[in-house]
Amino acid sequence: MSDSPFRNVALIAHVDHGKTTLVDAMLFATGVFSAHQERVDRVLDSNDQERERGITILAKAASVEWRGTRINLVDTPGHADFGGEVERALALVDGVLLLIDAAEGPMPQTRYVLSKALARHLPAVVVINKVDRDDARIEAVVDEVYELFFDLDAKDEHIEFPIVSTIARKGRAMTGVGIPGDDTDLSALLDTVVDTIPSPSGDPSGSLQALVTNLDASDYLGRLAIGRVVEGTLRSGNQVALCRSDGTTSTRRLTQLMGFEGLGRVDVSDRVAGDLFVVAGFPEIEIGDTLADAIDPRPLPRLTVDEPVLKMTFGVNTSPLAGTEGRFVTSRQIRDRLEREVLGNVSIRIGETSSPEIIEVAGRGELQLAVLIESMRREGFEFQVSRPEVIVKDVEGVRHEPVELAIIDVPDDHVGTVTQAVAPRKGTIVALEPGETGRTIVTVKAPSRSLIGLRSLLMTATRGTALVHQQHSGWAPWAGELPHRQGGAMVADRAGISTGYALDNLQKRGTLFIGSGEQVYGGMVIGENSRTEDMPCNPAKPKQLTNIRTHAADEAIQLRPPRTMTLELALEWIGSDELVEVTPTAVRVRKRTLTSRAAVS
């Protein structure tokens, strides 16, 4: 093994298998958190939605020192929707830590990222975590890991991986299969990483080539570029060439160079081949650009990511409530925010439409687009979006659409729920794998457009116990029309404040999306009709006052709880003539045309 003073390693794990707990323990074991400091749980999951959704969205890095070797840890998203982040994370590293739960075994998210790592010929250290669980089945899980590598056509050298057993929450590890004792720490894991993961290749004395894989921003330094030095040495104060995507090259002096230390960044004088860097002072730099030798610039191959399969429109909010709940409401502000997203997210694309106030946004999947919308909403943006549509293409004159594999992990008693959910969506069950933990993995192949909303549906039907992983599986001839919702829309025909009296009458006609005392406007969808046609209604209708006392039953209005329209549910529910209004405080469904007569056409 090379005596290089650092290792670059990516972390691959499924939801709740202990990835962030393990990183916390490694930071503590190597002194990043001192004994008197309060530790911050889930340090790498710094994005609010990552903590809430239990997924990793952004690829982040931390660095620890272990016995003279710096280990750069790069987190990887586990979902195919964030494939752009996965590719960029793996471009930074020379090996992976594959973290597996000792009871649950390999899971869908694990398979996707591991397949990408094996395609890059990255060696793995397999970590079996939570080996102290009462339901741990360590030997069986190890066998399942080997089966996973075989299924992914791993080469012999990749299958000969070391195994480390850990109890991350207690900071214990041992090599091989077993349960670490009370006298152990994480030394076995850290030593295995240093001994197994190859040191970075590249000659520090060679011609400079450094690949930009991510972007960040600083209030003081402006745009920051994050990446890896592939060849040569990046030195602060030297002239470097910036090689752009359009083939142009510009030269300037590197004034601000940083490296990773613990959870932060520190100023450094240089970064040698194989190390990770952060640079400032290049306001036009983009992901995939190369920082090269000023005299002999040689650009590196640009990063490639999977093509978008879904598109939708983002536009200025045109409802009567526009501007009352958000801070950023103009088309210029929305466009600037989306352009910033594209700069830092290579798997998102934006395009023009026939209206300057409406922008088309394409992404890898429904989850990725929903995360973008939710991020903007929390930042104070107010806008309206259309239903996601698949991107189609012609193959030899035949219309083709994207097809996905949905790998659904559910308790055994909910397998029937899955089959009932996918049957009307033209999905085909291609595999059914009962596990030893009372759960079954159902693999479904279906058109991408038919899977919109499936995650929310299954989460509701299984009371939050379903795990759904979707990944692109190619293209297939157009599958024809798919069934949408059966009921029409209940559409408010005027503005006002909803009343219990009006809603009591309307709830007999369908399912309500609003409660009493809410602001409504003409063209706003306030519920789903039990019949197929749209129904105009007045949810603000007051009860006529008389001097005649009514029966007590008339006084006691019992409203059923309204259906809460989350962002994902709303995106699935709406049709082509409807939009979702998104503000920092509300998610509303509305008709595209708000005049009462046209809105209910």
What are these regions (language model features)?
Residues 123, 133-195:
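Canonical P-loop GTPase G-domain recognition
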Residues 1-100, 104, 140, 144, ...:
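P-loop NTPase switch module centered on the Walker A-proximal segment
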Residues 4-10, 15-18, 80, 103-115, ...:
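Conserved structured catalytic cores and adjacent interaction surfaces
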Residues 586-601:
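Acidic, low-complexity intrinsically disordered tails
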Residues 319-342, 560-562:
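A short, contiguous, amphipathic alpha-helix enriched in charged residues
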Residues 39-44, 152-164, 200-211, 246-260, ...:
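Interdomain boundary/hinge elements
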Residues 16, 22, 54, 73-75, ...:
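Residue-level signature of catalytic and energy-coupling elements of molecular machines
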Residues 209-312, 322-324, 487, 494-546, ...:
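Conserved nucleotide-binding/hydrolysis modules and their immediate coupling elements
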